[in-house]
Structure formats: C-alpha cells, structure tokens
C-alpha cells in the first residue's frame, strides 16, 4: 500500500511539472507572437492598415538589431488624402539574408502596388540600399518575410512621405494674346497645343467654332497631291544575315523635321510644326568601295506633299490668316554607301 501511494504522488508531481513547462512554452510563443504583431501583421492573409497624413517610418522587428526568424509582416499604408501619392525611402542601414543565385528566396522585403497587384521590387542582402519607390495612388503595400535560418542585422527601416499632386495649368501656353506675340514666340506657343481645336480656341477665343468649321470647307482650290510610294526591292537569293544587314544598315528611316526649317520659312507658322519623313540613316561598316571611310547618302529622292495648317500674319491689320496648305518635303527612298572625301579607284 505504501508503495502504491508513492507511485501516485510521483505521477502527480511529474504531471504538474509537465503542465508548467507546457504553459511556459505557450506563454513564450504568445509573447513572441505579440512582439511580431506589434509592428505589422503575422498572418500573410491579413495586413495591418496604417493610415498616414504625414511622414513616418516602419521597420523590421528589433531594428537595427537582428530580426527574428519565421516572420511574415504585412503593412498597407493608406494616405488620408486620396489625391496624393506615397514615397518610400529606405534607411541606409539595410541588411537581410544574402540572396541565392541572385534571387531573394528566404529573407526579403518587397513593395507592392495595390492598384494592379504588381511588385515594384524585392530586396535582400546588404550590398546596396534599395532606391526610392513611389505609389501610383494613395496606398502602397510592404511585406517582410524571414525563414527559420540565418537571420541578419540590422534588418530594414522604411521612411514614408506624402507627395502632393502637381498643380496643372489650365490657361493657354502663353499668357499674352496671340496678337501681342512675335512670330517666333507665337510659333513656340502654337507648338504646345495637341489638337487643332485647342489651337483655334487660343487664336480666336470669341469665334473659334466658326473658324474651325470654315477651315474645312472647300472654299479654296484643291491642290494636287503627289504622294509617291516607292516599291521596296526584294532580293530573293540573299543570305538571311546579309538581308538583316541591309535592313538595319544604310536605309531610309523615320526622322522628324521642322517644317519651317526645312522650307526656310520665317514668315509663317505651320501646325503641326514637325512631320515624319524618310531620311537615310545608319552606318556603312561593310562598305564595298575601296576607301578609308564610307558615308550613307540618298540615292533616290522624291517630293511628298503633306497637308498642314498654315498661319500667316494679315497685311495691314492684326490677326492671322488661317488655311490648309500642302508643303513639299524630301523623302529618301533609296540609300547607298559612298566614299567620304577622296576615293581610290
């Protein structure tokens, strides 16, 4: 009987010690979880929403010391003003577990654009400090992950700030009326407009609709237009590599030119002021001629007519005469490599 009593007493004491140890372990885990959630959200399916109206910062746990293992923290910064953006600046003290094969697989911090779910960047290691990141709207998401191995220090700290929206000018490109501008200044002002309607509104604010309607009425003689499209020759037996060289070496390609400069006209304004033309361009590395240096020159040149809006000062009175007109510009249809300077043979 005495032996049975001793066995029961020993079992009870052992159970008490086991329960105390389990309670202690549970308490430690709860304390660790509380520490993690103090600066973010541990569950990756949830996030801590941080409402901001000014500058501030978030950081890895225990920054600038070694961060804990097995951590997932998610923050979503939301600015109070819906019209602002958020800029993130990383502290120079940055260090996470090094990447493997140039990939941040284990410990990393990443920034996500919530509007479309795109990841702006993922960073780890300690080689370079990540650059500034800016949200598209008034919120941005940050996620920090560490695995169960090799925690590093100092972790990271991200400073956030508010970027106010830029004030857009609703006035015309020039504060002076068109009649008070010189032709060169007026040309610069005209260039800033995107559509004919905006341009006519600027030139004739009181009667712009009438001028715009009359602009397209066929009240003037229609000029002939010679839009010449040369046929591109194709060599059927050329090696593919040589064909690629021909395509990307000395060939006609798109260039934008100023109409006033091309026509050498300083007495009038054209809109649009620039047009695309075909001009010879590229290099002549494989020049077939026996010379020290080759240059790419046009071999066949044609004139093409482009219909544009012409603005000419009225004689004797203020204002501009507006009309649609054709301008002839040179287009290079074929190009060739020739010797620059003196040739030999």
From Swiss-Prot:
Pfam families: CUB, PDGF. Coiled coil: none annotated. One of its GO terms (molecular function) is protein homodimerization activity. Highly expressed in the kidney and adrenal gland. In the kidney, it is expressed in arteriolar smooth muscle cells and in epithelial cells of individual segments (at protein level). It comes from the Eukaryota. Residues 46-163 form the CUB domain. Keywords: Cell membrane, Cleavage on pair of basic residues, Cytoplasm, Developmental protein, Disulfide bond, Glycoprotein, Growth factor, Membrane, Mitogen, Nucleus, Secreted, Signal, Ubl conjugation. Residues 24-45 are annotated as: Disordered. Residues 24-33 have a biased composition (Polar residues). GO terms for biological process: animal organ morphogenesis; bone development; cellular response to amino acid stimulus; digestive tract development; fibroblast proliferation; platelet-derived growth factor receptor signaling pathway; positive regulation of cell division; positive regulation of cell migration. Its main location: cytoplasm. Residues 1-22 form the signal peptide. Residues 34-45 have a biased composition (Basic and acidic residues). Induction: Up-regulated in mesangial, visceral epithelial, and interstitial cells after predominant injury to these cells. Expression levels increase in hepatic cells undergoing in vitro transdifferentiation, which represents a model for hepatic fibrogenesis. Expression induced by indoxyl sulfate. Expression induced by angiotensin-2 via EGR1 in smooth muscle cells in neonatal but not in adult rats. InterPro entries: CUB_dom, Cystine-knot_cytokine, PDGF/VEGF_dom, Sperma_CUB_dom_sf. It is found in: Cytoplasm, Cytosol; Secreted; Nucleus; Cytoplasmic granule. Glycans are attached at residues 25, 55. Disulfide bonds join 104-124, 250-294, 280-335, 287-337. The record marks 225-226, 231-232, 234-235 as: Cleavage. SMART domains: CUB (SM00042), PDGF (SM00141). One of its GO terms (cellular component) is plasma membrane. Belongs to the PDGF/VEGF growth factor family. Homodimer; disulfide-linked. Interacts with PDGFRA homodimers, and with heterodimers formed by PDGFRA and PDGFRB. Interacts (via CUB domain) with PLAT (via kringle domain). Growth factor that plays an essential role in the regulation of embryonic development, cell proliferation, cell migration, survival and chemotaxis. Potent mitogen and chemoattractant for cells of mesenchymal origin. Required for normal skeleton formation during embryonic development, especially for normal development of the craniofacial skeleton and for normal development of the palate. Required for normal skin morphogenesis during embryonic development. Plays an important role in wound healing, where it appears to be involved in three stages: inflammation, proliferation and remodeling. This is Platelet-derived growth factor C. It comes from Rattus norvegicus (Rat). The lineage of its organism: Eukaryota, Metazoa, Chordata, Craniata, Vertebrata. The gene is Pdgfc.
């Amino acid at each position: 009987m005495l032996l049975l009593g001793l066995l029961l007493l020993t079992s009870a004491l052992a159970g008490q010690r086991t329960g105390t140890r389990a309670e202690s372990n549970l308490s430690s885990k709860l304390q660790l979880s509380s520490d993690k959630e103090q600066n973010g959200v541990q569950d990756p399916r949830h996030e801590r929403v941080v409402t901001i109206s000014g500058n501030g910062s978030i950081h890895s746990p225990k920054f600038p010391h070694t961060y804990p293992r097995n951590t997932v923290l998610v923050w979503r910064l939301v600015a109070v003003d819906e019209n602002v953006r958020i800029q993130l600046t990383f502290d120079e003290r940055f260090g996470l577990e090094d990447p493997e094969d140039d990939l941040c697989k284990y410990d990393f911090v990443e920034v996500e654009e919530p509007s479309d779910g795109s990841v702006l960047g993922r960073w780890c290691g300690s080689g370079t400090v990540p650059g500034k990141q800016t949200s598209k709207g008034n919120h941005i998401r940050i996620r920090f992950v560490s695995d169960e191995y090799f925690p590093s220090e100092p972790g990271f700290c991200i400073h956030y700030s508010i970027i106010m929206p830029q004030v857009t000018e609703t006035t015309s490109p020039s504060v002076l009326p068109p009649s008070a501008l010189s032709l060169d200044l007026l040309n610069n002002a005209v260039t800033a407009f995107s559509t004919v309607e905006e341009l006519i509104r600027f030139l004739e604010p009181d009667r712009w609709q009438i001028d715009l309607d009359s602009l397209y009425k066929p009240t003037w003689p229609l000029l002939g237009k010679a839009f010449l499209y040369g046929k591109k020759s194709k060599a059927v037996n050329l090696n593919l590599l040589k064909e690629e060289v021909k395509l990307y070496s000395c060939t006609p390609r798109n260039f934008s030119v100023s109409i006033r400069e091309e026509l050498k006209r300083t007495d009038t304004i054209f809109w649009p002021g620039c047009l695309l033309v075909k001009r010879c361009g590229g290099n002549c590395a494989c020049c077939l001629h026996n010379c020290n240096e080759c240059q790419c020159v046009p071999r066949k040149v044609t004139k093409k007519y482009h219909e544009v809006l012409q603005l000419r000062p009225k004689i004797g009175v203020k204002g501009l005469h507006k009309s649609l007109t054709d301008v002839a510009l040179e287009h290079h249809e074929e190009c060739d490599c020739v010797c620059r300077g003196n040739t030999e043979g």
